[in-house]
Design a protein with these regions (language model features):
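Catalytic cores of DNA base-excision repair glycosylases
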Residues: 1-163, 167-176, 180, 193, ...
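Intrinsically disordered, low-complexity, charged terminal extensions of DNA damage-control enzymes
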Residues: 149-314
């Protein structure tokens, strides 16, 4: 699940930390969602963490705490699609089930010179048929892992290492001198700008944060420095001031850039004073530096947290 849309080298430290904390389906099922999100903090795509916890509940309730070895059953688990099912069944249970990820698509598209949109439609189906046809019944997990590793280490998106590739002489894209034209995908959606304002509110060494509602389009259930969106940075700041009933210092403390899929998020960070007689709003919490380890923040707000900790240490 962690490897969905994330490279192995990025996942490894998270995986090791996760397995130390939640080594079984039972421990994951019993863990509070806040702890699960905290362990996932920084890895992104937090829906995967929620799906994994939901899958743990299903494994405990329907499969007696054991991961099913049947493809139909395993595909019922939240967050498990054909790619994850193939990887789990072939690697963990030695079942001859194909795996198709971005690396496999790239390798096959170049070797067999497959054109078209390979993430959907006829091209995608052709890739899956090839993966199924070529998959050996002996050690299918090793084959799938080797194929994915091939794409990750040799058949790279740019500057592929064709000189050491064992299939160079059979690669049609290489023979045609068009290796850079494969694979071809549908045009990516244009990047959209998102303007946000966040505020740093401190009181006696603690910082005010709040939990994002489940209705949020991003970062639902994670903690954040109070923030708001707008059509511009100025409007975002104005919206946040109105929401909190506060006035910000005019000088911007920092400007944080963050990318979420095809959205470029720009967060302007401001500072505001907290009146001692004022009551803390519902859903907000004062957090001291020693308690940060209890709260999961999205990566963009982790940058703000580092900034506040660095400033407080000076």
């Amino acid at each position: 699940m962690m490897l969905q849309q994330t490279q192995v080298k990025t996942v490894l430290p998270y995986y090791e930390r996760w397995m130390r904390a939640l080594p079984s389906w039972r421990s994951l099922d019993r863990a509070p969602i806040d702890r699960v999100l905290k362990l996932w903090e920084g890895l992104g795509y937090y829906r995967r963490a929620r799906n994994l916890k939901a899958a743990a509940r299903m494994v405990m309730e329907e499969y007696d705490g054991k991961l099913p070895e049947n493809e139909e059953q395993i595909l019922r688990l939240p967050g498990v699609g054909p790619y994850s099912a193939g990887a789990i069944l072939s690697i963990a249970f030695n079942r001859p089930t194909p795996v198709v990820d971005g690396n496999v698509i790239r390798v096959f598209s170049r070797i067999f010179a497959i054109r078209g949109d390979l993430k959907s439609g006829p091209g995608h189906k052709q890739i899956w048929r090839l993966a199924e046809y070529l998959l050996p019944h002996q050690r299918p997990g090793d084959f799938n892992q080797a194929l994915m590793e091939w794409g990750a280490t040799l058949c790279l998106p740019t500057d592929p290492r064709c000189s050491v590739c064992p299939w160079t002489t059979q690669c049609r894209a290489k023979k045609m001198g068009r290796i850079d034209q494969y694979p071809s995908f549908a045009k990516r959606p244009s990047t959209k700008s998102v303007f946000m304002a966040a505020v740093l509110i401190q009181n006696n060494g603690s910082v005010l944060i709040r939990k994002r509602p489940e209705s949020s389009r991003w970062w639902k259930g994670l903690w954040e420095f109070p923030s708001a969106e707008g059509r511009s940075q100025r409007e975002a700041a104005s919206n946040l001031e109105k929401e909190l009933g506060l006035s910000f210092e005019k000088a911007e403390l920092a400007n944080i850039q963050h990318q979420i899929t095809n959205h470029r998020v720009e967060i302007s960070l401001y500072r505001a004073a907290w009146l001692k007689h004022r009551k803390k709003p519902i859903g907000f919490r004062w957090v001291s530096p020693k308690d940060w380890s209890r709260y999961a923040l999205p990566s963009a707000h982790m940058k703000i947290r580092r900034l506040t900790l660095n400033n407080s240490a000076k």
